[in-house]
Structure formats: C-alpha cells, structure tokens
C-alpha cells in the first residue's frame, strides 16, 4: 500500500553524492602514497630539499632499490615504507573497531564532517610543507604523524559512510565502493602522467595534495546537500522508527506531514538521537552477517597479500630495454590495469547483484580467489628464489591481473552491499560499521601476508 508513495532518487542525486563521498574517502590517501617517492627523496638528502629532483625512470628504479645510493640512502628512507604501513594499518583497525561501538554515542554529522575537515587540514599542511625546508628526522616524524591522522579519521569516515549507506537500499553501498575504485584509477593515471612528463617530484607531490584538498571539499559540499534530498530523508526517517511505527511513518511522509521532531530530524542526524531500540547486540548482528564479514575480510587479505608486494615486482619479458619495461610496465600493466578492472567490478554491482545475499555461491566464489596466489607468484617476478616463472609472457600477467582486480571489486562490493540488509533496519548502521571493520581487518592481514608471499617467490 505504501510502497507506491516511496519517493524516487531524482536524477540519481543521492547515488551520485555517495559516489563522491566514496571518492573522497580513498583519493586523498591514494595520492599520499603515490607521492612516496617525494617523501623518500627528502629523507635521502642532507639538506632535505627535493625541489630540484626530476621524476624519471632512473630515479624511480633507484628509490625502489635499497642497494642504490641516491646520493646516500638514509636509514630513515630505508624504513619509510615499513613504518608507513604500521602507522597506517594500526589506526585504521583501531578506529574502525571503535566506530563500531561508539557510533551511537557520537553524532553522525560530527564523525563524517569532522573527519573530512580534519583530513582537509592535514593535506593543506602537507601541501604547505612541500615548500618548507627542515631536517630529515623532523620531516620523518611529522610525516608519520600525518599518516596516523589521515588513517584514523579515514577509518571513522569510511565506517560511518558504510553505516549511513546501510539504511538505504542495498545498491546504495555500491556507489561508495565505485567511488573508491575510481580513486585508484585517478591516482594510477596521475602516476603515469608524472613519469611521462619528467616533472619535479615536489611539483607532482604538490599537485597530488592540492587535488586531494579539492576532492575533500567537494565531498563536504555533497554531504551537506544530503538532508535536502527527499529520498534520503524518507529512508532515514524509516530507519529511525521502530518496526511497529514504520508503516505509519511511511504514510505520514507520503501525505507531506512531518513526523514528530519536525524538520530537525530530517537533517543528517547523529546516532545519539536514535531510540533505545537501536542499541542492538553486536553478537546478534555478527551472527547474521558473519559469512559476508569473513568473505570481505578474505577478499582483501588475498588482494593486499599479492598487490602490490608481489605484482609490482613482475617485469616485462618482451620489452627488452625499451621505456615500456623500465618506465611504464608496472604503472600500466600492474597499477592502472588493477584499478580499471577493480573499478569496473565495483561499478557492475549498481546494475547486477548476482549471486544473492543468501546464495552459497558468494562465499564459494570468494574462496576461489585463492587461485590467484599461485598464478601471480608464477609470473615473471624479479629475483625468483623458490618458484619458477611458468607464465613469463606479459599477456599472462595482464590477464591474471584483470581477473584478479575485477573479482576483488565485484565480490567485495556485493558483500558490503548485502551485509546491512541481512539485519533489521534499526541494526543496519551497526552492520555497516562491522562490515567496514572486517574490510580493514582484511587489509591488515593482507599486509602481513604480503611479506610471506614475497619471501616464498
């Protein structure tokens, strides 16, 4: 009876807003790690000035090789990637977990807007420091503090967005995943353009950081526009109501009447305003979504275990000494290839959601991704110690990477979409937060697994 009165998402405005928010969660951090060469170059120079260093094939290879002095590879530069991973993964896990328990006590608007503003501030400071000279140790410490802050607020932002999308129809988690996929594509293109242009490291890095600021500002504006969307308000009010009130709430909205609490409740509400029945047991929710939660965790464990630790070490077998081998093979065949097909996989869930949320095929397909571990490890990886190179030709690697990336994007997006729909509407936000935690757990486990897989090649 009431379904005919449900508002439509006019011009797909809410869908597009969540797409931009998804882009805003990942693009800043992707640009930050894309500028790793800029950070290590500043740590490698005694005066900490990288303003005159050009980005070239030679400098890219040198910075990737710990045995190369450039002019002298400092101890801070040598440990940069390991410490960066630690400073990124620990806050990501801790704050995603905290958000699962505290999201009802801290308002949603504070968590999302506060996180976006904090990330914006960090990137403004980062862009400013490109032009500031300082000693290597101070630069290293400040950079690690920024990494902790970006990932702490990024974890809160991502978990809160997945929780917010959980109160909408299932396919509204897809634009967040798709936006995150597009972030990877943008950074890959930016990396290739920077290498091709031979631009100074500082100029490329400054461009990355300013672009990140612009995207975060756009995400803030989009989030502020959400309360004006009737479609969004409709599902938010439905979620705020208890199960017995939902039918009445639908009728009130369809007749143009404001539910009790007026327009104020129609804004971007904080979980502290939710009724007591939202305080559901975490264990009960986990019992409903554990298969999907473990699935998304396993997906990202396999993905990060191989990409980029193993895949970025593959070299072209057909290019000889051409620029394709030395400059473009890894940026194109590895990073761009992965990000394009990952984005396509994530985006496909907007129009196709097979298999269904209760289908046994979903966890089976997730488990089948383990086959990519031997396939990619048997490609033409540099410095093989234990495994032969059975798939030497570039076509094998490019094909495996495309399937690897597409399955990652599609299956992960399905799991994230279905998780909040396996529970009651009042539990959807908590379920979304829990799914986000297991996603981050998969990233952390994958980072640990990557050391083992690389050592076994």
Swiss-Prot record:
| Membrane topology, from the record | Multi-pass membrane protein
Record note on what altering residue 33 to M does: Increase in the sensitivities to dipyridamole and dilazep
Q: Where is this site: Essential for nucleobase transport?
A: 415
- Where are the Phosphoserine modifications? 254, 273
Main subcellular location of this protein, as a coarse class: membrane
User: Could you tell me in which tissues this protein is expressed?
Assistant: Expressed in jejunum, liver and lung. Expressed in testis at the blood-testis barrier (at protein level). Expressed in ventricular myocytes (at protein level). Expressed in kidney.
Record carries keyword Cytoplasm? no
Listed under catalytic activity are: adenosine(in) = adenosine(out); guanosine(in) = guanosine(out); inosine(in) = inosine(out); uridine(out) = uridine(in)
* Residue stretches of biased makeup (Basic and acidic residues): 255-266
Please list where the region (Disordered) is annotated.
Answer: 255-275
Recall the GO molecular function terms of this protein's record: adenine transmembrane transporter activity; cytidine transmembrane transporter activity; guanine transmembrane transporter activity; neurotransmitter transmembrane transporter activity; nucleoside transmembrane transporter activity; purine nucleoside transmembrane transporter activity; pyrimidine- and adenosine-specific:sodium symporter activity; uracil transmembrane transporter activity
Q: Name one GO biological process term.
A: purine nucleoside transmembrane transport
Note the NCBIfam families from the entry: 2a57
Free-text note regarding domains? Cys-415 near TM10 is a major determinant of nucleobase transport activity.
The function of this protein is: Uniporter involved in the facilitative transport of nucleosides and nucleobases, and contributes to maintaining their cellular homeostasis. Functions as a Na(+)-independent transporter. Involved in the transport of nucleosides such as adenosine, thymidine and uridine. Also transports purine nucleobases (hypoxanthine, adenine, guanine) and pyrimidine nucleobases (thymine, uracil). Mediates basolateral nucleoside uptake into Sertoli cells, thereby regulating the transport of nucleosides in testis across the blood-testis barrier.
Instruction: Quote the protein name from its UniProt record.
Output: Equilibrative nucleoside transporter 1
Origin species, per record, is: Rattus norvegicus
User: Gene of origin?
Assistant: Slc29a1
């Amino acid at each position: 009876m009431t379904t005919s009165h449900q508002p439509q998402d006019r011009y797909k405005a809410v869908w597009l807003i969540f797409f931009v928010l998804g882009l805003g969660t990942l693009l800043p951090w992707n640009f930050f790690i894309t500028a790793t060469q800029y950070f290590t170059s500043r740590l490698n120079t005694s005066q900490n000035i990288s303003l005159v260093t050009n980005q070239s094939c030679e400098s890219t290879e040198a910075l990737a090789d710990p045995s190369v002095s450039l002019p002298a590879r400092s101890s801070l530069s040598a440990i940069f990637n390991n410490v960066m991973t630690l400073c990124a993964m620990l806050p990501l896990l801790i704050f995603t977990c905290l958000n699962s328990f505290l999201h009802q006590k801290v308002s949603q608007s504070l968590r999302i807007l506060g996180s976006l503003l904090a990330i914006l501030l960090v990137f403004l400071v980062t862009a400013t420091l490109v032009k500031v000279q300082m000693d290597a140790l101070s630069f290293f410490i400040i950079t690690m503090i920024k990494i902790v802050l970006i990932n702490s607020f990024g974890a809160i932002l991502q978990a809160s967005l997945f929780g917010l999308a959980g109160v909408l129809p299932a396919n509204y988690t897809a634009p967040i995943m798709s936006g995150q996929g597009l972030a990877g594509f943008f950074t890959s293109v930016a990396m290739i353009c920077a290498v091709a242009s031979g631009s100074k490291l500082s100029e490329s890095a400054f461009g990355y950081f300013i672009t990140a600021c612009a995207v975060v500002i756009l995400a803030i504006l989009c989030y502020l526009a959400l309360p004006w969307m009737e479609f969004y308000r409709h599902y938010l009010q439905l979620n705020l109501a208890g199960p017995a009130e939902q039918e009445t709430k639908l009728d009130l909205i369809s007749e143009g009447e404001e539910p009790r609490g007026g327009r104020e409740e129609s804004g971007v509400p904080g979980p502290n305003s939710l009724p007591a029945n939202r305080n559901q047991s975490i264990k009960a929710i986990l019992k409903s979504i554990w298969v999907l939660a473990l699935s998304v965790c396993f997906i990202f464990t396999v993905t990060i275990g191989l990409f980029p630790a193993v895949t970025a070490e593959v070299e072209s077998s057909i290019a000889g000494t051409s620029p394709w081998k030395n400059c473009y093979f890894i940026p194109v065949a590895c990073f761009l290839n992965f990000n394009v097909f990952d984005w396509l996989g994530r985006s496909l869930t907007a129009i196709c959601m097979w298999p269904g949320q209760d289908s046994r095929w979903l966890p089976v397909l997730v488990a089948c991704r383990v086959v990519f571990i031997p396939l990619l490890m048997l490609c033409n990886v540099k410095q093989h110690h234990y495994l032969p190179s059975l798939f030497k030709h570039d076509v094998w690697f490019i094909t495996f990477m495309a399937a690897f990336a597409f399955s990652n994007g599609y299956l992960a997006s399905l799991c994230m979409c279905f998780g909040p729909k396996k529970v009651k509407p009042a539990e959807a936000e908590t379920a979304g937060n829990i799914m986000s935690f297991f996603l981050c757990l998969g990233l952390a486990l994958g980072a640990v697994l990557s050391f083992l897989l690389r050592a076994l090649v």
